[in-house]
């Protein structure tokens, strides 16, 4: 049944019914006073979610658009940048830097493992003669289910003194605390189809005063993604280009839901769902791709043995209409990924684990005790 479909992927994530109803409203003029009022309310709500007093700009784009904007607005061709690469999205930001003619130095870790903060210190210390202009880090690496130690990496960047820190928080913002002001994060990009609980189409970029100073001398080409245009219009509660008006309706409703739950409760819920999911996979003897010490609260990657990952995904969809994410690039067919991001609760985890047990049995996987996964998840959920 199509109306019973479950999205257990890291994006797009499930959308609450109240948000869907907001999407169904008649559009309004994006140059109207009514839209300006919505923009003003969104500005305050977005700052609350970002834990910042910095400007947070809203673009009609994806998370990749947010990150490209976050890179090109503050740098010039030939600038030295350091990019952390331990998955598909860290690699992507390196590709963006290469495309714009930046001098890109990559700090790498194997997929499934976190970046080593000390590697950033060593590289930045070696750049004293020609300092790096920016360090680009993916907080939650969606492709592998790894969360990087952003706080520790940021400490090394701050000790360096000059470099901006540019953060991909696409699957961390709204799932784990990203205290932008407390940590002094300069540029933070995210997308609406993740922790925001609304469909794809909006991107968000938080910009610090230090980054705006860099903007004044940055010369990389930009037009639609020129954040200066968005800043100027945001001050008047409008946008430089036509926005997806109904997504702003949805964002307003979603932010009201999040504020009613509270930031700490949101973070605790994601932590609890992650722990329940990982406990279930261990009980089913399904190897986890990332260690507990670096597990992302947004997504769990599983590397099954004795049963094909793609067969699991296919049968989960066919039998139960539950969508799981697959592996990307060289991990395609090697892992499957369970999203527990955004509008996901205890019932969703228990339903997904129960369905997974049935699928494993149907595929002939016998290395588990029936009911063990559900029991393990239930224990976590009942005590957390």
Swiss-Prot record:
Query: List-wise, which residues carry N6-(pyridoxal phosphate)lysine?
Result: 194
User: Which cofactors go with this protein?
Assistant: pyridoxal 5'-phosphate
Tell me the Pfam families matching this sequence.
Answer: Aminotran_5
Q: Does the keyword Zinc apply?
A: no
User: Where is the protein situated, by its record's location annotation?
Assistant: Cytoplasm
Q: Which GO terms describe its molecular function?
A: alanine-glyoxylate transaminase activity; L-serine-pyruvate transaminase activity; oxidoreductase activity
Q: What class of enzyme is it?
A: oxidoreductase
Identify the GO cellular component terms for this protein: cytoplasm
Signal peptide region: none
BP-aspect Gene Ontology terms: glycine biosynthetic process, by transamination of glyoxylate
Any coiled-coil regions, as ranges: none
Give the matching InterPro entries.
Aminotrans_V_dom, Aminotrans_V_PyrdxlP_BS, PyrdxlP-dep_Trfase, PyrdxlP-dep_Trfase_major, PyrdxlP-dep_Trfase_small, SP_NH2Trfase/AEP_transaminase
EC number(s) in its UniProt entry?
A: 1.12.-.-
Keyword annotations of the record: Cytoplasm, Oxidoreductase, Pyridoxal phosphate
Q: What is its main location?
A: cytoplasm
What function does the entry list?
A: Soluble hydrogenase catalyzes both production and consumption of hydrogen from suitable artificial electron donors or acceptors. This subunit catalyzes the tritium-exchange activity.
State the family it belongs to: Belongs to the class-V pyridoxal-phosphate-dependent aminotransferase family.
Outline the subunit composition: Heterodimer of a large and a small subunit.
What protein does this entry describe?
Soluble hydrogenase, small subunit
Starting at the broadest rank, the lineage of the source organism is: Bacteria, Bacillati, Cyanobacteriota, Cyanophyceae, Synechococcales
């Amino acid at each position: 049944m199509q109306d019973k479909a479950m999205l257990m992927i890291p994006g797009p994530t499930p959308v609450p019914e109240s948000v869907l109803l907001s999407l169904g409203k008649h559009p309004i003029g994006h140059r109207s006073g009514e839209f300006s009022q919505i923009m003003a309310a969104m500005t305050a709500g977005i700052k609350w979610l970002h834990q910042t007093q910095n400007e947070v700009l809203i673009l009609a784009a994806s998370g990749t658009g947010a990150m490209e904007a976050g890179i090109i607005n503050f740098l010039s061709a030939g600038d030295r940048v350091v990019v952390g690469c331990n998955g598909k999205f860290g690699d992507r930001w390196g590709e963006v830097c290469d495309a714009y003619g930046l001098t890109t130095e990559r700090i790498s870790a194997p997929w499934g493992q976190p970046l080593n903060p000390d590697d950033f210190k060593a590289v930045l210390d070696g750049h004293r003669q020609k300092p790096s202009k920016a360090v680009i880090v993916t907080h939650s690496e969606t492709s592998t289910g790894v969360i990087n130690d952003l706080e520790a990496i940021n400490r090394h960047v701050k000790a360096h003194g000059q470099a901006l820190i540019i953060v991909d928080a696409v699957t961390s913002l709204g799932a784990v605390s990203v205290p932008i002001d407390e940590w002094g994060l300069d540029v933070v990009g995210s997308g609406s189809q993740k922790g925001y609980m609304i469909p794809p189409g909006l991107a968000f970029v938080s910009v610090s005063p230090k980054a705006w100073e860099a903007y004044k001398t940055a010369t990389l080409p930009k037009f639609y993604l020129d954040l200066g245009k968005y800043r100027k219009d945001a001050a008047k509660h409008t946008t430089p280009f036509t926005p997806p008006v109904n997504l702003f309706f949805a964002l307003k409703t979603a932010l009201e839901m999040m504020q009613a739950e509270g930031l700490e409760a949101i973070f605790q819920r994601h932590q609890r769902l992650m722990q329940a999911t990982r406990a279930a996979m261990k009980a089913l003897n399904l190897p986890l791709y990332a260690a507990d010490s670096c597990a992302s609260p947004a997504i769990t990657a599983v590397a099954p043995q004795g049963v094909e990952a793609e067969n699991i995904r296919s049968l989960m969809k066919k039998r139960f209409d539950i969508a799981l994410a697959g592996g990307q690039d060289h991990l395609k067919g090697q892992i499957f990924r369970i999203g527990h991001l955004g509008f996901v609760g205890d019932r969703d985890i228990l339903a997904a684990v129960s369905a997974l047990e049935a699928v494993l049995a149907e595929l002939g996987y016998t290395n588990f005790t029936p009911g063990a996964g559900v029991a393990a998840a239930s224990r976590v959920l009942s005590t957390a």
